[in-house]
């Protein structure tokens, strides 16, 4: 088996080695899993619900929500509404507790008769420490059928970028890949 490599000159071995390293590096950059239906009716009412931020990066949820709203509208989801928290009771817990804010948003979406809600969580949204400082993003998305509370589609993914890329740019690429099979008809 290794006798084949004896016939390759040193330049060829270096090229072969570099190709193998590049292939391994590129294949390790993105990990994605998806589950559920992928075609949704454009006539149904949609709401973008708050995300849970587990990343430790302040306001990462707001950034993801804005990028996601733009990508969904580009896919043809023209009737997408964005949930905005109304602090009528001057209660700070929903602002500080992502899970509680998400639960209250889902309840409000049900009362407002939305059919689908899209939400999720941010697991990672930062730059890796070290010389390169590459961006690293980890996201979970869920589409919830609001009247039933059933999760009808979900996706999770992680992506790392190169040193010159931004976290938002890497996040946008990951969101685009997560939504690649979703069709709005």
Labelled PLM ranges:
Residues 110-120:
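Mid-length scaffold segments of soluble, non-membrane domains
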Residues 84, 143-144:
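Hydrophobic beta-strand positions
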Residues 55-56, 126-128:
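Short, solvent-exposed loop/turn segments at secondary-structure junctions
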